[in-house]
Amino acid sequence: MFESSETEEIANQVNLSSLYEIAKNSAQIGNEILKINYNKIQKISSKGRKGDLVTNVDLEVENKIKEYLLEETPNISINAEESGTLNKSSDLTWCIDPLDGTTNYSHGYPFFGTSIGLVYKNNPIIGAISVPYLNELYSACIGL
């Protein structure tokens, strides 16, 4: 957890409110794609471990969010669940789970969403989770 001086250090280096909006927008991008593709036939494959699935929708959401983040924050690293890390040698890293609940989604169960986080030196500072079924967006930002 951050001390107040560390929170001030982060706030002095980045525009937290702007990054917070970008995180929420990213989660909403995922939300819209998940809604459009829900209950449609999709390509499903295994990522290795039994029950660890990936669908074409996971990949589509991840790609759209990465495009958006690279456009809005080109100097921030990205760690995406399906494609790995795009390292920019930054203290900041976006973490993307494009379809949190792939098994539920692929079986037609409505409990899934998109999760986005921003970490600073391996400490979480921003998080946003969209849940299409509930039409909700949950989010938090350190210091705001």
Which role does the model predict for each range below?
Residues 1-99:
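N-terminal subdomain of lithium-sensitive/metallo-dependent phosphomonoesterases centered on the IMPase/IPPase/PAP
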Residues 88-143:
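DPxDG-like acidic metal-binding loop motif
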